[in-house]
């Protein structure tokens, strides 16, 4: 089988899902036990949205498959255990939306039976069979059956609202202790009934496709739920860069490059002779400092010593 297609009927005002996750039971082989239940999942991606069910689907499906194959050629392989864990986690988050998609009918290409019996979801198994309505295939459905893909017609049901949320009164605005009057802009009836305005209650049809189903025909569907594209992202573990022992960081406080010469000797010498010129004038203090430098023979101040000798001794 080349592809399987889901045609979802929804209201124009509702948001379509980027992808759907379909879960079904795989046909057992002769070597497998009869009591063993093999459940498989398949991702269906959104190809396009059409306004009528009479639109031919073959061209949209083929174009979407070709585009998807081109994208896969440029994308690395995503088959990893971490991806499977992400899919399972997202499946649990989307369990509340399982009942939103109801399967109406299933059609196989080149089949003797134009319409396969209505397939219900797992939640509809308790409903008596006489309550399940069987729909006859339309002309558009018969036209699409001739294509090389299996077609499922579904309806996106809106969630039931048990408790309607009442609009609360807006906060009162005061100006100088006087209540302000709110004015609302009203839309004229002519604007509401304009031809270019779309009716949100009209129905459109979302076409989803899957080109990688390798287990024969899809049957015994358990559920259909939204699938998040972000689940395919594989988060690679961050590996720290290799650090060699002979490398060091210049910004570290204890790095040998940040060692500065000690100034304790100069500060001790100044503290030792500060008493000689603490209470005297600046000239006497400078002279005491120069005598101290002569005594200890500091080579760093040779220029100052020579100037001092010329001033004192000529």
UniProtKB/Swiss-Prot annotation:
One of its GO terms (biological process) is protein transport. Residues 243-253 have a biased composition (Acidic residues). Pfam families: Iwr1 (PF08574). Residues 243-269 are annotated as: Disordered. The keyword Cytoplasm applies. GO terms for cellular component: cytoplasm; nucleus. It comes from the Eukaryota. It is found in: Cytoplasm; Nucleus. InterPro entries: SLC7A6OS, TF_Iwr1_dom. Keywords: Cytoplasm, Nucleus, Protein transport, Transport. PANTHER family: RNA POLYMERASE II NUCLEAR LOCALIZATION PROTEIN SLC7A6OS-RELATED. Directs RNA polymerase II nuclear import. Belongs to the IWR1/SLC7A6OS family. This is Probable RNA polymerase II nuclear localization protein SLC7A6OS. It comes from Xenopus tropicalis (Western clawed frog).
């Amino acid at each position: 089988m080349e592809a399987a297609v889901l045609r979802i009927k929804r209201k124009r005002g509702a948001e379509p899902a980027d992808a759907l996750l379909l879960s079904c039971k795989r046909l057992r082989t002769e070597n497998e036990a009869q009591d063993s239940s093999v459940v498989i999942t398949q991702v269906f991606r959104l190809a396009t949205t059409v306004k009528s069910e009479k639109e031919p689907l073959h061209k949209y499906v083929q174009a979407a498959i070709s585009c998807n194959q081109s994208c896969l050629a440029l994308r690395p392989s995503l088959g990893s255990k971490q991806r499977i864990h992400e899919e399972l986690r997202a499946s649990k988050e989307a369990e509340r939306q399982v009942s939103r998609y109801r399967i109406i009918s299933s059609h196989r290409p080149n089949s003797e039976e134009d319409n396969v019996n209505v397939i219900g979801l797992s939640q509809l198994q308790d409903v008596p069979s006489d309550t399940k309505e069987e729909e006859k295939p339309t002309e558009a459905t018969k036209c699409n059956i001739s294509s090389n893909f299996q077609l499922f017609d579904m309806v996106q049901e809106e969630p039931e609202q048990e408790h309607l949320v009442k609009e609360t009164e807006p906060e009162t605005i005061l100006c100088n202790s006087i209540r302000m009057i709110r004015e609302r802009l009203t839309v004229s009836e002519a604007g509401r009934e304009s031809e270019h305005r779309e009716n949100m209650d009209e129905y459109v049809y979302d076409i989803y496709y899957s080109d990688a189903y390798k287990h024969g025909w899809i049957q015994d569907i358990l559920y259909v739920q939204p699938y998040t594209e972000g689940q395919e992202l594989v988060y690679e573990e961050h590996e720290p860069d290799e650090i060699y022992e002979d490398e060091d960081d210049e910004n570290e406080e204890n790095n040998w490059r940040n060692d500065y010469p000690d100034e304790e000797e100069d500060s001790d010498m100044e503290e030792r002779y500060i008493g000689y010129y603490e209470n005297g004038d600046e000239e006497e203090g400078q002279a005491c400092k120069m005598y101290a430098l002569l005594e200890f023979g500091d080579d760093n101040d040779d220029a100052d010593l020579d100037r001092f000798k010329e001033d004192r001794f000529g």
